[in-house]
């Protein structure tokens, strides 16, 4: 599994009278570097209480004429991917100019962690490109299926190709979304209770993953009827048993719960223990606790 490491930084909280020049002087970093790292734009007005990220690099490099990211990486014993991760101002591109300061390394590693990000096929490619260097997985949202277990038509070729270019593992998000764009408990119930449809979906899923270059699947069934909890876990296990020998990773997306006995259609069929053991990994959807359309509350239980 490819994982991402942390880096050292100071978070400067803007005080009355602060300027970018003063902040740069205070923390001994070049002003252009501070501007680039925070993606600030003229006229660079600051507001008290605003936070400015001040990276604390261990080793830097000043770009010379004729340099490329590849040549800089080779000269300094690093990789282009590491340069992208250390220099968000590059936006995942190879655009550099003489005199520009690049961070080669940071001293204190905070640890290692796997990062997943969701994307619609319609995502702004500039946003995707600047984000990919920081991801381990890219979950392409989403694909559905019909009552016979056939995968519905979709196109994710570009996202899969870009993910692979940035050494990110693309995942296909399999959902029970209906034609109205809402999760359908009825669709989940039909699938989980018709053996031929389940078997067909699993085989069709294996074919799609292979044909389109995915590294795995994220199974995201929401509002599953409580009486189908065991059948849902069994389905996820069957998917893993079919896909694991081919090297695919199977994720289960879990609704955020405060207890195993939590009531509600979103939660009751999501048995953490059963789904956790059935899948290779789990994605805890804390973003479904407090979100834009919910009552005012915290973003995770």
What would you call each of these model-derived segments?
Residues 6-27, 50-77, 100:
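Primarily a LysM-type cell-wall glycan-binding module
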Residues 19, 33, 68, 79-137, ...:
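Non-catalytic accessory regions flanking glycosidase/transglycosidase catalytic cores in CAZymes
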Residues 40-57, 94-107:
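Short, structured interface segments
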Residues 107-199:
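Glycan-recognition patch characteristic of GH18 chitinases/ENGases
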Residues 114-116, 137, 169-173, 216-218, ...:
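Structural preference for beta-strand elements that scaffold enzyme active sites
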Residues 118-122, 143, 175-177, 222-224, ...:
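Active-site beta-loop-alpha junctions enriched in small/polar residues
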Residues 147-154, 230-233, 238-301:
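Substrate-binding surface in catalytic domains of secreted glycosidases
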Residues 202-231, 281-295:
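Active-site groove signature of glycoside hydrolases
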């Amino acid at each position: 599994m490819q994982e991402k490491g942390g880096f050292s930084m100071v978070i400067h909280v803007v005080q009355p009278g602060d300027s970018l020049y003063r902040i740069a002087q205070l923390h001994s970093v070049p002003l252009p570097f501070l501007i680039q790292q925070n993606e600030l734009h003229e006229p660079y007005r600051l507001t008290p209480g605003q936070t400015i990220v001040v990276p604390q690099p261990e080793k830097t490099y000043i770009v010379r004429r004729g340099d490329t990211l590849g040549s800089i990486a080779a000269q300094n014993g690093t990789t282009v991917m590491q340069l992208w991760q250390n220099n968000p101002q590059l936006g995942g591109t190879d655009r550099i100019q003489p005199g520009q300061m690049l961070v080669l390394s940071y001293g204190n590693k905070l640890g290692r962690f796997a990062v997943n990000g969701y994307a619609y096929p319609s995502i702004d490619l500039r946003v995707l490109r600047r984000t990919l260097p920081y991801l381990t997985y890219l979950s392409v949202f989403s694909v559905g299926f019909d009552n016979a277990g056939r995968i519905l038509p979709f196109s994710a070729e570009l996202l899969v190709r870009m993910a692979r270019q940035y050494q990110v593992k693309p995942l296909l998000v399999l959902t029970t979304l209906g034609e109205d764009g809402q999760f359908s408990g009825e669709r989940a119930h039909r699938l989980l209770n018709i053996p031929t449809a389940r078997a067909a979906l699993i085989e069709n899923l294996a074919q799609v993953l292979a044909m389109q270059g995915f590294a795995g699947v994220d199974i995201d069934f929401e509002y599953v009827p409580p009486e189908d909890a065991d059948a849902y876990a069994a389905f996820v296990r069957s998917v893993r048993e079919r896909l694991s020998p081919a090297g695919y990773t199977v994720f289960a997306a879990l609704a955020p719960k405060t207890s195993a006995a939590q009531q509600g259609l979103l939660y009751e069929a999501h048995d953490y223990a059963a789904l956790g053991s059935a899948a290779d990994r789990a994605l805890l959807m804390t973003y479904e606790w407090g979100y834009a359309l919910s009552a005012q509350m915290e973003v995770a239980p």
